[in-house]
From Swiss-Prot:
[4Fe-4S] cluster binds at C12, C96, C199. It catalyses: isopentenyl diphosphate + 2 oxidized [2Fe-2S]-[ferredoxin] + H2O = (2E)-4-hydroxy-3-methylbut-2-enyl diphosphate + 2 reduced [2Fe-2S]-[ferredoxin] + 2 H(+); dimethylallyl diphosphate + 2 oxidized [2Fe-2S]-[ferredoxin] + H2O = (2E)-4-hydroxy-3-methylbut-2-enyl diphosphate + 2 reduced [2Fe-2S]-[ferredoxin] + 2 H(+). Its EC number is 1.17.7.4. Signal peptide: none annotated. Keywords: 4Fe-4S, Iron, Iron-sulfur, Isoprene biosynthesis, Metal-binding, Oxidoreductase. Its cofactor is [4Fe-4S] cluster. One of its GO terms (biological process) is isopentenyl diphosphate biosynthetic process, methylerythritol 4-phosphate pathway. Isopentenyl diphosphate binds at H41, H74, H124, S227, S228, N229, S271. This is 4-hydroxy-3-methylbut-2-enyl diphosphate reductase.
Length: 316
């Protein structure tokens, strides 16, 4: 039984930045430090940060007045930002810069009075934050959420000829392409972003798992169940005709999965650390793996800067 590792896999620049913001804020200010929502969607990472003193909450009313709060990599609405300011909270923003780019795009269309369509998953924190960039007081248009092609077919917008779209950054590239095609067919004058809003890390990891699936009869994706991009990786492998399972750690591997399997692919979502992948490899060796090789993949060199206050602390 041979194991093939996808490349790239695991942490992206936005996740690296978000985790580092929490760690450095704790080092700089001490505990408690509050984090609104899981800073990234990975149980192992969140548990580690809890042990360091981070307190995770879902809403700002759970944060004491004047305390320090970190916004997660998924971003927050303008209403949350206003609430934090009104309560005198010290804020460090771990929103991924690629999510911020989408937020700025939504705000720009709002100012022009254009209607806006967001392609995304209802209830996902990134979607809630992006929808919350729409300021009815500063624009006359509306924002709509579509999750699939069926939503496009039944969508009624107020301004079909004054319309734009954007996307959640962690969606399936293939699914998003199909939805965009449906939008363009129904609304021929709709405007889109200059560049695809699916983030570079999402696309690279999906390309890598597609290549992996061509050579394997089983693909294991390391990632937590609430990780959007990790779920898309497992779904993509399945669409390529390969059995695939999303696992939080090596402990979730069922030995029955690897019976009569000759090539097992392993990848990890953008919020899953390499230590979890290492654990999966060790478990596969126990189950009979004879070798591990790694695809060359697409190199990633993206690095996002920390907030200025944390950079200054490093210099000091």
């Amino acid at each position: 039984m041979k194991v093939l590792l996808a490349n790239p896999r695991g942490f992206c620049a936005g996740v690296d930045r978000a985790i580092e913001i929490v760690k450095r804020t704790i080092d700089m200010l001490g505990t408690p430090i509050y984090v609104r929502h899981e800073v990234v969607h990975n149980r192992f990472v969140v548990d580690d940060l809890k042990q360091r003193g981070a307190i995770f909450v879902e809403e700002l009313h759970q944060v004491p007045d004047g305390a320090t709060v970190i916004f997660s990599a998924h971003g927050v609405s303008q209403a949350v930002r206003r609430q934090a300011a009104q309560r005198g909270l010290k804020v460090f923003d771990a929103t991924c810069p690629l999510v911020t780019k989408v937020h700025l795009d939504v705000a720009r269309h709002c100012r022009t009075g254009r209607d806006m369509i967001l392609i995304g998953h209802a209830g996902h924190p990134e979607v809630e934050g992006t929808m919350g960039q729409w300021d009815q007081e500063r624009g006359t248009g509306r924002i709509y959420l579509v999750e699939n092609i069926d939503d496009v077919a039944t969508l009624h917008v107020a301004q079909p000829h004054h319309l734009a779209y954007t996307t959640q950054t962690t969606l399936s590239v293939d699914d998003t392409r199909n939805i965009i095609d449906a939008l363009r067919q129904r609304f021929p004058t709709i405007q889109g972003p200059k560049n695809n809003d699916i983030c570079y890390a999402t696309q690279n990891r999906q390309d890598a798992v597609r290549e992996l699936a061509r050579e394997c009869d089983l693909v294991l994706v390391v990632g937590s169940p609430n990780s959007s991009n990790s779920n898309r990786l497992s779904e993509l492998a399945q669409r390529e005709g390969v059995a695939s399972y999303l696992i939080d750690s090596a402990a979730e591997i069922d030995p029955a999965w690897v019976i009569d399997k000759h090539h097992i692919g392993v990848t990890a979502g953008a919020s899953a650390p390499q230590v979890l992948v290492d654990g999966v490899l060790a478990r596969l060796y126990e189950l009979g793996a004879t070798s591990v090789s790694e695809h060359s993949g697409k190199p990633e060199s993206m690095v996002f800067a920390l907030p200025k206050a944390l950079r200054l602390q490093l210099v000091d």
